Amino acid sequence: LLWNGRRNRDEKNLEHNSKFQQMIRKLLVLLLCLTAATATAKKPKSSASKKAESSAEKPKESDYDKLFKEKHTVADGMFRLHDVKGKLYFEIPDSLFGREMLLGSTISEVSDNAAATTGSKSDYPLQVVFTRNDRSVQLRTVNCENITDETGASRALAEAVKRNTADPILRNYKIEAWNRDSTAVVVNVTDLFVADVEEMSPFSKYGLYTAFELKKTFQKERSMLGEIKAFSDNVVVRSTLSYIFTLTRGRTTLVKDQPLTAVMTRSLVLLPREPYRPRITDSRMSVFPTGKVLFSEREQRAKVIYYAHRWRLEPSDMDAWKRGERVAPKKQIVFYVDDGFPEMWKKHIFEAVDQWNEPFGRIGFKNAIAAKPYPKDDPEFDPDNIKYSCIRYAPIAIANAMGPSWVDPRSGEILNASVYVYHDVMKLLNNWLFVQTAQADERVRAVTIPEEVIGDGLRYVVAHEVGHCLGYMHNMSASAVIPVDSLRSPSFTQKYGTTTSIMDYARFNYVARPGDR
């Protein structure tokens, strides 16, 4: 019995040990499986796995990078300009929203100079401002004709005028992207520069075709973006615009579906933050005006006032100027002379500008105005940029010259002025000299008038147009103060001329008779 009992205990122990060993074996198998799984996890990842993981970790491409990831033309300045496959994008910084600008258009090339003249500005520039909301950027034309008297108008009156003369929206552009540091927005402005914008049309109101009824159709497929430039206070965009046009007069069609292509240079110029102090015109002085309607509580009516057009001519040394000394201005008035003029003309054109230094000297300025050749080594110079005032040669059979100017509408300050001298001005001078002076001057009794005579006539014409550029209107009363018999006196005419103002239309001395000198 004892042996049987021991045997039973031994059998139970063996059974227990066997179960324990089986459990150990299972644990070992499980451990081996885990080790194998870990080893498998540490194996090099497949290329597909790497791509998936890289894609997950790579930051999302921004709208800005998507727009400009391909190679394209960029111009940096007041705005950053991007030309992407013929589309023009403006990158407008936050600091320039709300700043007033001038948008002007100049004709750089044209296929038909009867429609417009190279170098001319077909219309007045637009005063514009950029505004924005969260979704879009608005290009607005500034409504500044109605003003209030700062000292005599209440805030309520000023707000009422503002509400009733809000700035209209010329264009509304979707915000395409923000730049990388979120300080500027990007908009596509192609439709402002490669489109038919009536306010910037290449068909000049001074062209020969204004005598006819003109119907034009813009040809988008033949139009394209050109050169872009950007500077610290302006940007320049050149584009080629194509049209077909028809000319009629009454029931007669003179030209039908005639093609025209013009290269236009558009300048967007930042206006000074603080406008020049306006000066109210004096009716006794013939100066060009900019009209305003003044609303004031001190007046019992809306009052029309006029700001005089004038250059910002300020003494460089105010104390010396007040003592009566002649001083140079802080900024000289400069006219750049077109290098396309016939060589014989140039000398007389430079003299025409320089002679204006005499009247400026009488008000205390020396070297107030100058004529200079087109600069060869200035990368910023562009005669079609409204920053530069020029005297332009127009090879067209028009017997005339003209001197328009552009002003800051807020103050009347002249910002740009150009003289256009048409080729047949020489024909006009030839006719004037022969008809008006041949009876007393045998030198003009010829098919070709000597340079000393016709050159002096050209100087007179250009000086008259420069006077317009300085803000002066015609003064038809100037010659009325000179008695007729004085016009036959050599001593008088050599000292005083034939009129008291070059802005008169007193061409030449047609009162002189044979024998007078």
For the regions a language model picked out, list residue spans one by one.
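Sec-dependent signal peptide recognition
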Residues: 24-30
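Hydrophobic h-region of N-terminal signal peptides that target proteins for export
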Residues: 32-40
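Auxiliary tRNA-acceptor-end handling modules of aminoacyl-tRNA synthetases
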Residues: 43-341, 359, 374-450, 458
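Zn2+-dependent metallopeptidase catalytic core
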Residues: 97, 340-368
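Short alpha-helical catalytic segment bearing the HExxH-like zincin motif
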Residues: 351, 453, 457-465
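Active-site recognition of the HExxH zinc-binding catalytic motif
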Residues: 356-357, 460-475
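Conserved catalytic/binding loops enriched for acidic/polar residues
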Residues: 479-517
